[in-house]
From Swiss-Prot:
InterPro entries: Hist_DNA-bd (IPR000119), Histone-like_DNA-bd_CS (IPR020816), IHF-like_DNA-bd_dom_sf (IPR010992), IHF_beta (IPR005685)
Name of the protein this chain belongs to: Integration host factor subunit beta
GO biological process, one term: regulation of translation
Free-text function comment from the UniProt entry: This protein is one of the two subunits of integration host factor, a specific DNA-binding protein that functions in genetic recombination as well as in transcriptional and translational control.
Gene Ontology CC annotations of this record: chromosome; cytosol
Amino acid sequence: MTKSELIEKLATRQSQLSAKEVESAVKEMLEQMATTLESGERIEIRGFGSFSLHYRAPRTGRNPKTGTSVELEGKYVPHFKPGKELRERVDAVNV
């Protein structure tokens, strides 16, 4: 599901809100989440999951085009850990 599909689905389910209001709310929520992670804070949405930053240590990588070794710096990357309710709902799906 893309962001625009999410906005469309929410606007359909929340008929009292216009599509523009839903779009604004979704964009603001995502912006706040990004800002919170950017400041190094953790985000927890009970039943859904938590977002945090994990440190990825410096390592030697490989340029896939040329095959040469490249030194990659350490960095923080976003990490999502699903909550219990979300895990149970996904586990219940028979694919």
